């Protein structure tokens, strides 16, 4: 497992007093106490549940699962995200205090998976709703891969600068690595307008004249069938 680049200590005096910067101290405290909000909707989340056991013991990384987004600084999405649950996911992310991070776990969360080919209600990538810091592919990813993703996120936190973090835009916070996959022909655009998520469902009203006109032109047997 790769070692984490902890913030450097400036100097140590003769009285064993350690001096450092406030930015390094803040990064060290945050990377050592990530509190995740677990958002599992499918089978990938079962692999994450195995991390709670004694074999992997993810508590040693300072991870304390929280049930409230207001107490979490990391949200881990695992499983398929549908259009109906998209507003709830966006609302949970907006309720999390800054700085906050996102780990997308599994193929269904990253691209929609096998449900994105012929499903009209599947979001083809959670990054169309919220910014993602670490992508964790797999179907499902192994617990060791989840630990590696958390390690990469901790490295990212250790290198952050408070001024850059405040001034950076949300769309530029993604963290990923180069891959060797070849991009094929796109069959689905997967572009979703977040403004549509907050609109109330429209109701179509049929006038009584149109209804009775259609009813008179169709026999009662056809209406039953």
From Swiss-Prot:
GO terms for cellular component: chloroplast thylakoid membrane; respiratory chain complex I. It comes from the Eukaryota. Binds 1 [4Fe-4S] cluster. The keyword 4Fe-4S applies. Its EC number is 7.1.1.-. The keyword Transport applies. One of its GO terms (biological process) is electron transport coupled proton transport. Transmembrane segments: none annotated. It is an enzyme of class 7 (translocase). It is a peripheral membrane protein. Keywords: 4Fe-4S, Chloroplast, Iron, Iron-sulfur, Membrane, Metal-binding, NAD, NADP, Plastid, Plastoquinone, Quinone, Thylakoid, Translocase, Transport. NCBIfam families: nuoB_fam, PRK06411.1. This is NAD(P)H-quinone oxidoreductase subunit K, chloroplastic. The lineage of its organism: Eukaryota, Viridiplantae, Streptophyta, Embryophyta, Tracheophyta. The gene is ndhK.
């Amino acid at each position: 497992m790769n070692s984490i680049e902890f913030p450097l200590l400036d100097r140590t005096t003769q009285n064993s007093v350690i001096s450092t910067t406030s930015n390094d101290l803040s990064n060290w405290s945050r990377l050592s106490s990530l509190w995740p909000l677990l958002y599992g909707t499918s089978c990938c989340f079962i692999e994450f549940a195995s991390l709670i056991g004694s074999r992997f013991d993810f508590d040693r990384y300072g991870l304390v699962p929280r049930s409230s987004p207001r107490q979490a600084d990391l949200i881990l999405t695992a499983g398929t995200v549908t259009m109906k649950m998209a507003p709830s996911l966006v609302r949970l992310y907006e309720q999390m205090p800054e700085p906050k991070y996102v780990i997308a776990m599994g193929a269904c969360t990253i691209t929609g998976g096998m449900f994105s080919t012929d499903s009209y209600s599947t979001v083809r990538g959670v990054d169309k709703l919220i910014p993602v810091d670490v992508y964790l592919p797999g179907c499902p990813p192994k617990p060791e891969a989840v630990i590696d993703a958390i390690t990469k996120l901790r490295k990212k936190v250790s290198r952050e600068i408070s001024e850059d973090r405040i001034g950076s835009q949300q769309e530029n916070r993604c963290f990923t690595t180069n891959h060797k996959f070849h991009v094929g022909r796109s069959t689905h655009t997967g572009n979703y307008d977040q403004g549509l998520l907050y609109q109330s469902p429209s109701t179509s009203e049929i006038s009584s004249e149109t209804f009775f006109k259609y009813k008179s032109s169709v026999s009662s047997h056809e209406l039953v069938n």
